[in-house]
Amino acid sequence: MAAKEIIFSEKARSRMVHGVNLLANAVKATLGPKGRHVVLDKSFGSPIITKDGVSVAKEIELADKFENMGAQMLKEVASKTNDHAGDGTTTATVLAQALIREGCKAVAAGMNPMDLKRGIDKAVIAAVTELKKISKPTSDDKAIAQVATISANSDESIGNIIAEAMKKVGKEGVITIEEGTTLENELDVVEGMQFDRGYSSPYFINNQQSQIVELDNPYILLHDKKISSVRDLLTVLDAVAKESKPLLIVAEEVEGEALATLVVNNIRGIIKVCAVKAPGFGDRRKAMLEDMAVLTGGTVISEEVGLSLEKATTSHLGKAKKVRVSKENTTIIDGMGDNDAINGRVKQIKTQIEETTSDYDREKLQERVAKLAGGVAVIKVGAATEVEMKEKKARVDDALLATRAAVEEGVIPGGGVALIRAITAISNLKGANEDQTHGIQIALRAMEAPLREIVANAGEEPSVILNKVKEGKDNFGYNAATGEFGDMVNLGILDPTKVTRSALQNAASIAGLMITTEAMVAEAPKKDEPTPPAAGGGMGGMGGMDF
């Protein structure tokens, strides 16, 4: 086992704080509308230029082991806030730095670290309660666009495209972000339920121009096994043909005689039909077929529930306004399922999302919710170069997550103003003893840090602006982009409540741990071993050779 180096108390904390400052100073340069870029070197490919706090934090690794511990703990604040709320990483870093710096100073002055931590925690709980009081729900597209714009570093085009995507697929809908091929951002919306399986035979195609199958007001047969004998289908085919309606068959596989018969009947015009493989595998396939059944008001014909294909009638079939099948995808538009049943199914899947521990399962379950609840929107990010594309895509990701957070918990005035109002509301808070009260004061001072940093990055004097904002009431704040004061909500400068709350709670959590640290243990640096002396003397018989 390698030897360890151990440092204690003030020496330990000062090395840790130095690491915190190095990381925080690099990250906080990106805060606010006039925040600067940070360039990150990559071992291969072009460097990355970013204004995303968590991207900067993730790249930082310090040579000194003890300083690096401080930096890594601060990095945890940024990534936890990013995972939980999708934005606010720089705010969290700035808050944590202020709490740690002031807290460690107080410990050095002889105050009890545990009481300081209790004071900070007490102030944060009170501040979070106050933020929830200030919070307003996001009810309209305009507010959603404003939140997305702020999170995308004041890029209105990104804000508007996210608001449009949310409007089209609903708040539960899936919005995915891809790299585009043009200079402009594009939005593609897939209505209804789409799954990645196409027609079983090109002979089903009825729209030759687009090379797709289009079925209007079709019946939908859902089966969880293979269909190879046409005898199994005769009852259903007869009933559907009598009503002169098209039919979509979704089964594990339609093959052999059954597929050939369907193709022949389709070509002759006896019945308009299309067969498609069921999506997914195993249990996930069963669940997706059940989703389709709920969406279309049908029943999955399965032996598990005592149903066989021969006995199936039109009452077991689902219905939809339109079905579109291409070579690779099937889209069911406007399923005729019962709304209460659909909502119940969505609720059931959401419970599974909360219980699952696998990220992959969670993602797949969220996709299922979206397909039942709204649809899928794809934002294609456009840019001139690959470097710009990566930077822009990261901003769109941030903006989307921040927007979801705003929809979830509402919005508060941005630009650090909500924290200033929370300070005013809880300024009379007292602890159980003097050290706890000092901890509360540390937290209240730290809550000024985001506004100070936004102003400093805009090239103004933080103390002057801060005092003016403190004198104001409610939403009155400073717009760093234009250098004007005004109502932050009317100016469209909004932050999701969840983002600010998470930033404050995560910053306080890590700061509390650092303040109460008394010893640090790291691997001792290896001493350089002396190099062995060079072999003496030349080689005999080599004299006269010119080297």
From Swiss-Prot:
EC assignment: 5.6.1.7
Reactions it catalyzes: ATP + H2O + a folded polypeptide = ADP + phosphate + an unfolded polypeptide
GO cellular component assignments: cytoplasm
CDD domains per record: GroEL
Bias type Gly residues, positions: 535-547
Chain positions recorded as ATP binding sites: 30-33, 51, 87-91, 415, 479-481, 495
Class of this enzyme: isomerase
GO biological process: protein refolding
Chain segments annotated as transmembrane: none
Database matches in Gene3D superfamilies: GroEL (3.50.7.10), GroEL-like equatorial domain (1.10.560.10), TCP-1-like chaperonin intermediate domain (3.30.260.10)
Keyword terms: ATP-binding, Chaperone, Cytoplasm, Isomerase, Nucleotide-binding
Family the entry assigns: Belongs to the chaperonin (HSP60) family.
Database matches in NCBIfam families: GroEL (TIGR02348), PRK00013.1 (NF000592), PRK12849.1 (NF009487), PRK12850.1 (NF009488), PRK12851.1 (NF009489)
Name of the featured protein: Chaperonin GroEL
